[in-house]
Amino acid sequence: MHEQLSPRDQALEARLVELETRLSFQEQALNELSEALADARLTGARNAELIRHLLDDLGKVRSTLFADAADEPPPPHY
């Protein structure tokens, strides 16, 4: 039949269960953080692409408004 565990073995088993529980929670947290990081990277890539398009459009508008760079007003610090 089952042998009764000594107090030392019971303490070790309790510590092992606690460590396994902590590891499980840490693995879950790591997976959640990994997913959040992947989402953030995707959002960053989308935003970078959007900014590139906006800058492109701004350049086109600017070139339409100021066909010659000499016609463009000087920057505010002049």
Swiss-Prot record:
Pfam families: SlyX. Coiled coil: none annotated. NCBIfam families: PRK00846.1 (NF002024). Belongs to the SlyX family. PANTHER family: PROTEIN SLYX (PTHR36508:SF1). This is Protein SlyX homolog. The gene is slyX.
